[in-house]
Regions:
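Positively charged n-region of N-terminal signal peptides that target proteins for export
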Residues: 1-4
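Sec-dependent N-terminal signal peptides
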Residues: 6-11, 125
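C-terminal motif of bacterial Sec signal peptides marking the signal peptidase cleavage site
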Residues: 14-17
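Heptad-repeat coiled-coil amphipathic alpha-helices that mediate oligomerization/assembly
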Residues: 19-21
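Active-site-proximal mixed secondary-structure blocks
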Residues: 23-202
Length: 202
């Protein structure tokens, strides 16, 4: 059951918002008239869980430097308690964003209506240039200084609780061994972050 909760996915949750606020978070209406806080736990109770069905953008850093990438693996559920909503994301050590995830305590995941955003973010590396600027995205920050993009449809802010640096010894069958065979970016690190803020565009 714990595994099911942790790796349950994001689609229905992200599609639904609630008016009441039960977890401490910034009111992004101070920064944008179109992003409104919603209650993640209440959305859990109304919708249950489903698998990831679309790509999302992961961003980490602070007000001086940050980077974002496309993610297709992950989930949302409860971790270390029934009332502690959490997000699970996977970042390979060869990715530029991995350096930010290792250094900074918080990150955001975002949903966009325009698929060209996650297509570009997944194709190019931040080592070679400012991807947000190339896409015309505007960086903003939560009250904790966590970066996100003003144009996002959904923004979820997380504080990392657990980072699991997988090795081949962690694999229990041949599926991950076969998948990672020849994968140059390396075996993904699994990050589990407590959700400390969630906003959606009205």
């Amino acid at each position: 059951m714990k595994k099911q909760l942790i790796f349950a996915a994001l689609a229905l949750l992200l599609a639904t918002g609630c008016n009441q606020q039960k977890i401490e978070q910034t009111n992004m209406n101070k920064e944008s008239n179109e992003l409104t806080a919603f209650d993640v736990q209440e959305a859990f109770e109304k919708n249950g869980f489903t698998w990831f069905t679309e790509n999302l953008i992961l961003c980490s850093g602070d007000t001086t430097r940050n980077n974002a990438m496309t993610i297709g693996w992950g989930g949302i559920g409860n971790y270390l308690g029934h009332n502690r909503p959490a997000v699970t994301v996977y970042v390979a050590p060869g990715r530029y964003t991995w350096e930010f995830m290792e250094k900074y305590p918080r990150f955001t995941i975002m949903q966009f209506d325009d698929p060209s955003i996650w297509q570009y973010m997944g194709k190019y590396s931040g080592r070679d240039g400012d991807k947000a600027a190339a896409l015309g995205l505007h960086v903003a920050y939560t009250e904790h200084g966590t970066p996100y993009y003003e144009e996002a449809k959904i923004v979820i802010e997380c504080e990392t609780m657990t980072a699991w640096h997988q090795t081949e010894q962690d694999f229990r069958n041949d599926t991950p061994k076969q998948w990672y065979d020849g994968f140059e970016p390396g075996i993904h690190t699994i990050y589990i972050g407590e959700i400390i803020g969630a906003w959606k565009r009205q």
